[in-house]
Swiss-Prot record:
Residues 63-78 have a biased composition (Low complexity). One of its GO terms (biological process) is auxin-activated signaling pathway. The keyword Cell membrane applies. It comes from Arabidopsis thaliana (Mouse-ear cress). This is Protein BIG GRAIN 1-like D. Residues 23-47 have a biased composition (Polar residues).
């Protein structure tokens, strides 16, 4: 019994190793036989623990020594005992025969993937390693190339100095453009007449409200005028219209005495009378009253000069005919008749009639 404990058999050691490999948690102490000295025997007895299956399997399968000694046949020839302080390292016993344990699948898989990766890496075609661009990338490259070409072209072009002639031309163009803008606003100026009674009123461009200004000027033919300004928006043309509504029909037999009658201010009375009445009288009434006064004075002058009563009767008949034939349409013939005798006075202007109501005209 003592001999079996000192020198265990091969089968017992093999069973112990298999049991320890299956269940590594169980720790079992086993004495080891060292050299002849007793000190080395005590140091060689160590408690052996099984740490991990992998380490145990790697240490279990190793080279086997060939020794004829029965005492050292269980241990390998490469067994070493290193005593360094209290730590003692010794090689584990190696078994004869192949291992029946199954290899791990994880190790095989890792080796397979490593070999495959190396094969793929060696067979990789480096010529195909070209970056592929989609349409967006190509467009971006084209725009970048165009910008670079433009920038290089701008750098190559020398900057031309500003010539004084070009500055003068730009200055003149700016002046003409300002003049064209100012010419859009049309201003109305009154025309000069030979008589002193004319009073024209002109509205400036600063007036923002449309207004009507009336002025009456009585000359030998009792002409009245009216300025009427229409104010439009700021960007449009401003216009002014002058109206001459009231005129008198003068017969062809116009003498110097009759001209004196108009120059004395008799024709102006009818106009003033209409203004005092509030402008309610019509143009026809004013014209008829004016013609009656004119014919009466004309008859009196003919009686004094000639002394024929029959001529007065004829003039009365003519007076009735003139009053009967008088109408608003006859007033428009004044300028045609007056231009024969007084071309200097009325030749510069043409009348414009807006209404037949004297209250609005005068």
């Amino acid at each position: 019994m003592h001999k079996s404990k000192r020198n265990p058999s091969f089968s017992s050691t093999l069973l112990d190793e298999i049991y320890n490999s299956i269940d590594p948690k169980t720790q079992k102490t086993q004495p080891y036989v060292g050299s002849v000295n007793t000190t080395t025997k005590k140091q060689s007895i160590v408690t052996r623990s099984v740490p991990d299956r992998k380490i145990h399997r790697d240490r279990f399968f190793g080279s086997v020594s060939s020794s004829s000694d029965s005492n050292s046949s269980i241990f390998s020839s490469s067994d070493t005992e290193l005593t360094h302080g209290k730590k003692t390292t010794s090689s584990r016993p190696l078994c004869f025969g192949p291992s029946k344990t199954k290899p791990r699948k994880t190790e095989d898989k890792t080796l397979f993937h490593q070999n495959r990766a190396t094969r793929v890496y060696d067979d990789y075609d480096y010529a195909s390693d070209v970056p592929k661009f989609n349409r967006h990338d190509e467009n971006w490259e084209n725009t970048r190339n165009r910008r670079s070409v433009k920038s290089s072209g701008n750098q190559k072009k020398p900057k031309t100095p500003a010539s004084p002639g070009g500055r003068i031309v730009n200055f003149l163009n700016s002046l003409f453009s300002n003049n064209s803008k100012q010419s859009n606003a049309v201003k109305s100026y009154p025309r000069k007449t030979s008589y002193d009674d004319s009073a024209y009123v002109r509205k400036t461009s600063n007036d923002y409200h449309s207004s009507t200004t009336t002025c009456s000027s009585a000359s030998s033919f009792s002409r009245s005028c009216m300025n009427k300004g229409y104010e439009k928006s700021s960007g449009r043309i401003k216009r002014s219209v002058r109206f001459s509504p009231v005129n008198v029909i003068v017969p062809e037999s116009f003498t110097s005495k009759e001209e004196d009658y108009f120059s004395n201010g008799n024709a102006r009375k009818s106009v003033k009378k209409n203004v005092e009445d509030g402008g309610r009288r019509s143009v026809e009434e004013i014209a008829r009253e004016f013609l009656r006064d004119y014919h009466k004075n004309h008859e009196n002058s003919l009686v004094k000069t000639n002394g024929f009563e029959d001529y007065e009767d004829d003039d009365e008949d003519d007076d009735d005919d003139d009053v009967a034939s008088d109408s608003s349409s006859d007033l428009f013939e004044l300028d045609l008749v007056g231009n024969h005798h007084h071309h200097n006075v009325y030749g510069d202007e043409l009348p414009v009639y807006e209404t037949t109501f004297a209250g609005l005209i005068l």
